[in-house]
Amino acid sequence: MAENQYYGTGRRKSSAARVFIKPGTGNIVINKRSLEVYFGRPTARMVVNQPLELVEMTDKLDLFITVSGGGISGQAGAIRHGITRALMQFDETLRPALRAAGYVTRDARCVERKKVGLRKARKKPQFSKR
């Protein structure tokens, strides 16, 4: 690939994304597919573009992304996190704006495990008094 590319790893729920950015024309490739093909939902596409729109670099950078694990929402969040980290590596002066928007922080929320004796993580079997 290019000699002047920047890298960022993003994670969300059970998804992990590797993001490579380099100066270009705004081309986004996710797992060898375009953004529109990979994410059918407009909300997922919006989440992916959020950090680029914030720093006004939607048409100045090319992105090459590989993402695995989880579902659509988790993958979109992981890509957003990865893009944010790669942008900070690209230009450290972008950090305060990205931090203020809340994109730098890793969202630590994940699925709570199912407990023994319960139906789900917190749902208990029906209680009978008599």
From Swiss-Prot:
BP terms from Gene Ontology: translation
UniProt-recorded Gene Ontology molecular function terms: RNA binding; structural constituent of ribosome
UniProt keyword terms in alphabetical order: Ribonucleoprotein, Ribosomal protein
Family according to the record: Belongs to the universal ribosomal protein uS9 family.
Keyword hit for Ribonucleoprotein: yes
Gene behind this protein: rpsI
PANTHER family named among the record's database cross-references: RIBOSOMAL PROTEIN S9, SMALL RIBOSOMAL SUBUNIT PROTEIN US9M
Organism: Aliivibrio salmonicida (strain LFI1238)
A Gene Ontology term for the protein's cellular component: cytosolic small ribosomal subunit
Descriptive protein name: Small ribosomal subunit protein uS9
